[in-house]
């Protein structure tokens, strides 16, 4: 699933091609994605001008002058590309938003876990209402994590992936951040010290910023809007490396399932 760096990479790739463009039309080839596409998409987008493209957590918002924003989530396997308008659709190309300049914003989603919804300009969509702070913001600190974790018995990895705690940190970057901070993913969230949470917050910020710089992580599904892969996969320390040697100490990495998610860590470097 695309995580924050992949969505940020998508945002940065799309924004120069979209902002200021007038929307010519909308084609819905498959309106039943994770949720049905609301009627406002077909009714309000044609004729509207795109005023901004932004990200909140793993969601993209395409702001318009039509009184609201298109709200997109890439799901497990979705991608957005800006293409010449005469590019023939492929399998799983479910939505086209055609632009005044003759190009088209195309949403492809093989598994259909993504979504295209509408957020009124006067309201915050319910999917965004209860989200935690952005991990690269000043609001996300070790002190914040430590205070919120008090009394929590869930594994610290599960805690870190809770979108009400902090947004955009999924399985890949939670595993990598915990390894850099030297914290076992199995440790109870409420038993991690303030000093270690400060290291963890710093690790999250550093790893996410570097992953964005490297264009995200290309595993099975993600490609950037220009079709290029993300290169952070080459930098992974633990994620997807079960049974291999820890790059830090050389010991064999461990594997377990935490919160129904595969987890790899070093039993020596992470305590």
Swiss-Prot record:
Active site (record annotation): 2 (schiff-base intermediate with dna), 3 (proton donor), 58 (proton donor), 261 (proton donor)
GO process terms (BP): base-excision repair
Cofactor binding, note field: Binds 1 zinc ion per subunit.
Organism listed in the record: Xanthomonas euvesicatoria pv. vesicatoria (strain 85-10) (Xanthomonas campestris pv. vesicatoria)
UniProt family annotation: Belongs to the FPG family.
EC number, UniProt record: 3.2.2.23, 4.2.99.18
Encoding gene, per UniProt annotation: mutM
Positions annotated as zinc finger (FPG-type): 237-271
Keywords noted in UniProt: DNA damage, DNA repair, DNA-binding, Glycosidase, Hydrolase, Lyase, Metal-binding, Multifunctional enzyme, Zinc, Zinc-finger
Keyword Transferase attributed: no
Reactions the enzyme catalyzes: Hydrolysis of DNA containing ring-opened 7-methylguanine residues, releasing 2,6-diamino-4-hydroxy-5-(N-methyl)formamidopyrimidine; 2'-deoxyribonucleotide-(2'-deoxyribose 5'-phosphate)-2'-deoxyribonucleotide-DNA = a 3'-end 2'-deoxyribonucleotide-(2,3-dehydro-2,3-deoxyribose 5'-phosphate)-DNA + a 5'-end 5'-phospho-2'-deoxyribonucleoside-DNA + H(+)
Single GO molecular function: 8-oxo-7,8-dihydroguanine DNA N-glycosylase activity
Keyword Transmembrane: no
Protein name listed in UniProt: Formamidopyrimidine-DNA glycosylase
Binding positions (DNA): 92, 111, 152
């Amino acid at each position: 699933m695309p995580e924050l760096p992949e969505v940020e990479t998508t945002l940065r790739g799309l924004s120069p091609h979209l902002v200021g463009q007038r929307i010519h039309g909308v084609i819905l080839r498959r309106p039943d994605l994770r949720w049905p596409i609301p009627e406002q998409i077909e009714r309000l987008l044609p004729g509207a001008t795109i005023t901004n493209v932004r990200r909140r957590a793993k969601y993209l918002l395409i702001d318009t002058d039509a009184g609201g924003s298109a709200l997109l989530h890439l799901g497990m396997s979705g991608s957005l590309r800006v293409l010449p308008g005469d590019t023939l659709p492929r399998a799983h190309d479910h939505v086209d938003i055609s632009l005044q300049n003759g190009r088209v914003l195309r949403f492809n989603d093989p598994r259909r876990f993504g979504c295209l919804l509408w957020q009124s300009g006067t309201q915050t969509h319910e999917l965004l209402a209860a989200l935690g702070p952005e991990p690269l913001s000043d609001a996300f600190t070790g002190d914040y994590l430590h205070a919120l974790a008090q009394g929590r018995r869930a594994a610290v990895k599960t805690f870190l992936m809770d979108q009400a705690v902090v947004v955009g940190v999924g399985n890949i970057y939670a595993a990598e951040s915990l390894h850099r901070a030297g914290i076992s993913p199995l440790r109870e969230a409420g038993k991690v010290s303030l000093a270690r949470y400060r290291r963890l917050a710093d690790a999250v910020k550093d790893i996410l910023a570097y992953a964005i710089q490297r264009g995200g992580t290309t595993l099975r599904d993600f490609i950037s809007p220009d079709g290029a892969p993300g290169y952070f996969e080459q930098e992974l320390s633990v994620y997807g490396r079960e049974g291999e040697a820890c790059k830090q100490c050389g010991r064999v990495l461990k594997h377990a399932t935490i919160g129904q998610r595969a987890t790899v860590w070093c039993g020596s470097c992470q305590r």
